[in-house]
Structures are given as structure tokens and as C-alpha cells.
Amino acid sequence: MKNEINMSDVWKWAKDLFPLNRSLTGIGNLETLKYLKDIDNNLSIKYFSSGKKVFDWTVPDEWSVKSAYLLDSKGKKLCDFGVNNLHLVGYSIGIKTTMDLSELKAYLHYDKNNPDAIPYRTSYYKRRWGFCISYNDYKKLIPGEYKVFIDATHFSGKMHYGELLIPGDEPSEILLSTYICHPSMANNELSGPLVSIALARHIKSNKVLRRYSYRILFLPETIGAISYIHKHQSILESNVIAGYVLTCVGDDREYSYLPSKYGDTLADKAVRSVIRFIDPNYKKYTFLQRGSEERHYH
């Protein structure tokens, strides 16, 4: 494994991983983790079994989708999952039916504020189906009957995740957590896993950074962190002295920082000591504006 960070490598990783259909579970997640393991062989690929109780949550069934699309009355294929996996609402059930456009519209999702974009929708914990379409394409739908085809199944399987431990001079750990459950979306969330695996390479090449140990997690959002905490709570409480959630770190906007619930932890102090030099105009949120794994690690 090369230890230096080469941005052309990171760009290639992003292009290779972008097409995969990631979700809470499924082959896309496993393929993503295997790809990351090829970058750093120390990454361990593990899983939680469907149906496992984790606190008051339950690990969901695994989801597999082969194809999904609509056909209009002229035989034109629309919302083709094979062209863009965002077209299918995540965790949709399988269905094969015909319905009029007036009825179909209840199952279509679009965003008027971003008329050229295909929105991202999921239904992890309620069995239903749906398609996502750009608003401009939605307006072009012709009246008549549409064939609906979704070849998807739910079954008792596995929810995979990745864990990378980098030992330091001390057993005290820095926790880095990111998530692998979004399909073809770059900033949210290929950026987090790629920055995390690149950081692992950088940490290993820099002895100055090896005072503390590092625990880097690649999880399905929410249920992944909850499951991991359920299994490793005592280890985390004993070893972790600071932690960060890496999410939406791939755009060109100002740096942003969401403080901890307490606001004065080691993690807070470390960020504040450097971010003002990197970007004096950085954006600071409040913990009340949390939206990712920081909810669970607290």
C-alpha cells in the first residue's frame, strides 16, 4: 500500500465507486467496502445480521434490486434504474403492474426547486415503492397507461460495514466515522469514505500523528452506528477521547464545523485551533443542527 496521498488516485476512486448502488444493505455496499480494502488491506469487512435487535432498533432485511423502470404507452423507457440508480426510491418493493398516469403520479417524486435534478428518496422502514424523476421530465409525461416494473427483493441477510484500526503509541483512540449508504451521490456521501481512507494512508505515513490510535468506521447511516455502539459501547467509552463524523466534505463551499453537545471537548478544541487558519470564514453550526451520526455517538 502506498502511504502518500495522490489526488489523482482519490479522483479515480470516486469515479470507480460513484455508479454503485449503495443503501443500508446490499451488494453495492459490499463492493464498495471491498474496493476500499484494496486501497488499505487493513480494513476489516464485517456485518450485522438482519433481524438483530440493537437497543430499540432492528437491523433491516437485506435489499437486492436487479432492474427497475417505467414504460409509457409508446414503449418509451423512463426512470431507468440501469441508467441512474437515483431513479428508484431506495428499498422499494418489487412490483409489476400497469396504471394510468393519474394514478402513477402518487408514486413519483421530483423537486421543483431543482428542475433538472433527480431527487434522492428512500423508504427503509416502510414497505412501498416509487420512482424519482426530474421535474422537467415529469412535465413531459404523456397521458395514458404506464407499465411499472421493479425487480427487487427483501430477505434476511447481512448489513455490512468496514472497520480500520491504526494502532498508535497510546491506546487512547480518535474515532473517525463516515457512512456508505448513499448511491450515486458525490458530496453526500462518497466524499466522507474517500477522505477517510485517504486520511488512513496519511496517518500511517506520518509518525507525528501516531501518538494516538485511530478507529475509522465505514457504516450505513444511523442503523450502522447504532448497531456498532450496541456491540462496542464499552470499548468506545474506555478508549475514545475524541471523534469526528466525516460527511459532505467534497464541495467547494466554506469549511463547516458542528460542535459537540458540550462544545468544549478535546475534539472541539482541536478543530477550533486549526480551522480558523484554514478558513477564517468557516461556518459554525450548533449541535441542535445535527443531522448525522453525531446524534448517536453522544
Language model segments and positions:
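N-terminal hydrophobic/helix-forming segments and targeting peptides
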Residues: M1-H298
